[in-house]
Amino acid sequence: LPEGMEQDPFFQQFFGQQFGGPGGNGRGNDQPRQQREQSLGSGVIVSPEGYVLTNNHVVDGATDVKVTLSDKREFKALVVGTDPKTDIAVLKLTGDKFNAITLGDSTKVQVGDYALAIGDPFGVGQTVTMGIVSAKGRGNLGIEDYEDFIQTDAPINPGNSGGALVNDRGELVGINTAILSHGSGGNEGIGFAIPINLARNVMGQILDHGKVTRGYLGVVIQPITPAMSKALNMNKLEGALVSDVSAKGPAKDAGVQRGDVILGINGNTVSDSNELRNTISMMQPGQTVKLTVSRNGGTKDIEVKLGELPLSKDEAASDTEKGGSKESLKGITVETLDSDTAQQLQLPESTKGVVVTGVDPSSPAADSGLRKGDVIQEVNHAPVKNAAEFEAAMSKSEKNGALLLVNRGGTTVFVAL
């Protein structure tokens, strides 16, 4: 086995422990010895000076990094910087000028384009596999904080992480990062690559500033579901719904409001909340952007000067009284929120609304994601302070559906019924 291959976590998932440890003969009968953990991955030389793009998870925690080229030459590498939020790392090889790959433009990649995955799967040596681009803009997979993956069926296996995804002109369009596998650890035709435009942006910031800074709007956003689209009288499932606005954020200062739907940035359509988040994150603090928002049936443009993404988020708070239990429409039981219940839910005592005390598991409310303990504060943008107001508001919304503002553990989200 190539040195270190058996320590790769993907290798262990695929083959188990049957091959023994480092230095073993595969029979598992070596004497115990002190071991040094090793792992492997791939990378791409992107400049003649020897800068290399790879994944953060390939080098995370490494004390020494060694790079072996396809011609068997070996080089020590310095980790210049990393960005765990996108899983990008930048390395620097020590040595003379290097042959570098040509960087492409990932915005020009189309579904159906040929794609080649280049890397060192299982440590067997440089390997090229071929497929097509299966999809673009894959997000919300829970792999990284910022996701805009190119999906490909070009076979990607353990050891390919950090390697190149190239187009039919040999241009680098992505950094292979992850595979979707049902327990085997091997390729099943669904691989994901970070677009080169995103990787290039991160690398540029690391080289220029030594760190990555991101633009910040100061809003909490969520996707537009079909039920929400109906409640908001929208014709298309596009944009990002603003479910909360930071009291001290740039969006608040510019006039963005909770319940706005952000449809565009600088004249470009925003397809969903993931695209909005990624687009803002690639912009720099201090940059002014023009947001196109939908509000109360009309659209307007709002200019926002971006701040810098903070390490923590501001939490939204609201305002209370007592009331009896009420059976509401669409499968939920609610009760007017009092100060004692607000304290139990770790909300300010002054919070007003109705607390969900029960949800019928076969009801539309359960399907929409409402939970016991949720605090409903608005129905169709109108505040509700007690169970009676909530009941009346829900009765009026039977025809077109209801858009509920829900406070869940101090965070507000919209739920459509």
Briefly describe each language-model feature range.
Residues T68, L78-V80, K97-V124, N157, ...:
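Active-site substrate-binding loop(s) of clan PA
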Residues V46-S47, D60-G61, S70, T82-P84, ...:
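A short, compositionally biased micro-patch
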